[in-house]
């Protein structure tokens, strides 16, 4: 049996669930009476979602639908970074919604500092865009997980590689 236990803190999302959510948004837009004739387009590219529509009101409706469908598929709302609304040709508006993935160095340092300050028997180390947390007791790791869930970070945190 291992003498130390560990887990990784990451910020990631299931790409296939996001694809499914965007497909549902597109189907909803085609089916909803108030959005049917707006020529709204929603496309998922590598690191963002591009939305183009007739008005800001319609854009807000698309945001609402996207948030609902993402929530139903267990995707955090924190993965969406709504960019500024740009006017496009012909009284249209467009917006790029960036997808957040990975933990920045600043947030990783905050997490590491919180763990060091509050939990003396637990070690945290920053490894790229993840934080590895290790301890001799699984119970200590579970307490750390509960404490981190109480914090409100600007990214969605997941706990992986629990060993």
UniProtKB/Swiss-Prot annotation:
One of its GO terms (cellular component) is cytosol. Signal peptide: none annotated. The keyword rRNA-binding does not apply. Gene3D superfamilies: 3.30.70.860, YajQ-like, domain 2. It comes from the Bacteria. Keywords: Nucleotide-binding. The keyword Nucleotide-binding applies. Coiled coil: none annotated. GO terms for molecular function: nucleotide binding. Pfam families: DUF520 (PF04461). InterPro entries: DUF520 (IPR007551), UPF0234-like_C (IPR035571), UPF0234_N (IPR035570), YajQ-like_sf (IPR036183). Belongs to the YajQ family. Nucleotide-binding protein. This is Nucleotide-binding protein Npun_R4736. It comes from Nostoc punctiforme (strain ATCC 29133 / PCC 73102).
């Amino acid at each position: 049996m291992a003498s130390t236990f560990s887990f990784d803190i990451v910020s990631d999302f299931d790409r296939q669930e996001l694809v499914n959510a965007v497909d549902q948004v597109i189907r909803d837009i085609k089916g909803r009476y108030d959005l049917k004739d707006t020529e709204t387009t929603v496309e998922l590219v590598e690191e963002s979602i591009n939305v183009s529509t007739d008005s800001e009101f319609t854009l807000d409706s698309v945001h609402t639908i996207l948030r609902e469908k993402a929530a139903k598929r267990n995707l955090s709302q924190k993965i969406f970074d709504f960019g500024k609304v740009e006017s496009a040709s012909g009284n249209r508006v467009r917006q790029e919604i960036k997808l957040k993935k990975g933990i920045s160095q600043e947030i990783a340092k905050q997490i590491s500092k919180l763990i060091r300050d509050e939990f003396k028997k637990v070690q945290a180390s920053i490894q790229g865009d993840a934080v590895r947390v290790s301890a001799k007791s699984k119970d200590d790791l579970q307490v750390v997980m509960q404490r981190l869930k109480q914090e409100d970070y600007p990214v969605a945190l997941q706990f992986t590689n629990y060993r």
